[in-house]
A protein has these predicted regions:
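Short helix-initiation/N-cap motifs at beta->coil->alpha
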Residues: 92-103, 186-200
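Sec-dependent bacterial lipoprotein signal peptides
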Residues: 1-20
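Bacterial lipoprotein signal-peptidase II cleavage site
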Residues: 18-34
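Short, solvent-exposed loop/turn elements at domain surfaces
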Residues: 61-66, 122-123, 175
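Alpha-to-beta junction loops
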Residues: 88-89, 106-115, 162-163, 190, ...
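Extracytoplasmic small-molecule ligand-binding "clamshell" domains
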Residues: 39-116
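Acidic, polar ligand-binding/catalytic clefts
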Residues: 80, 89-155
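Bilobed "Venus flytrap"/periplasmic-binding protein-like clamshell domains
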Residues: 56-61, 71-84, 135, 139-195, ...
Length: 206
């Protein structure tokens, strides 16, 4: 027996993504006749019997965010589809982003993590990652009517007195620390608070 962890999810997610890509001809009847072998698989343990528990930081729409207190978004839908394929119930645990991998590695909180997370060597030491399923760019945001523009941002943001709000533990934080060493990098627990700080005049950029 072993924990489900991300090791099993790696295979399941890859299979699920392949299934989604060719399932346009499936019928409701076929959906109700899932392979019993998935449901009968007892080679792993779960945090909660019969339930796939997903850890996330629900502040990153459209991948994961809260609507009326419920986690929704692309990652949530993807993980729920995996749970359905395994014949499991599904739950989401909302945690601060910089605690997700340590929480997964420690066990007892959640079985898998989906949180728009970039694969990095340091993170791979704590957990096994699936194949990349989405590629995107990151950008620094500033107030629209301010003096900083995309043409001068590289120089203007790298000055003493500039405060850049970042979400703690993200690759965005790493990028800002490496590229704006003269600015003050102020971590926040979630991206919502980071943007709120800028809008309140407590930060120059996010």
């Amino acid at each position: 027996m072993k924990k489900l962890g991300v090791v099993l999810a790696a295979g399941v997610l890859a299979a699920s993504l392949a299934l989604f890509g060719c399932s346009s001809n499936s019928t409701a009847g076929n959906d109700t006749k899932k392979d019993d072998s998935a449901k009968a698989d007892t080679s792993y343990t779960l945090v909660k019997d019969g339930t796939l528990t997903m850890g996330t930081s629900a502040d990153y729409p459209p991948f994961e965010n809260l609507e009326n207190g419920e986690a929704v978004g692309f990652d949530v839908d993807l993980c729920k589809a995996v749970a359905d394929e395994l014949g499991l119930k599904f739950e989401v645990v909302n945690n601060q982003f910089d605690t997700l991998l340590t929480g997964l590695a420690a066990g007892g909180k959640f079985d898998v993590v989906l949180a728009g997370m970039t694969v990095e060597p340091e993170r791979a030491e704590l957990a096994d990652f699936t194949d990349t399923y989405y590629v995107d760019d990151q950008a620094v945001a500033v107030m629209k009517d301010g003096a900083i523009t995309k043409d001068n941002a590289k120089e203007e943001l790298n000055k003493a007195g500039v405060i850049i709000a970042v979400q703690s533990g993200t690759t965005g934080e790493t990028y800002c620390r490496e590229n704006f060493p003269n600015a003050t990098i102020q971590p926040y627990g979630n991206s919502t608070d980071s943007f709120a700080a800028m809008q309140a005049g407590q930060a120059t950029a996010v």
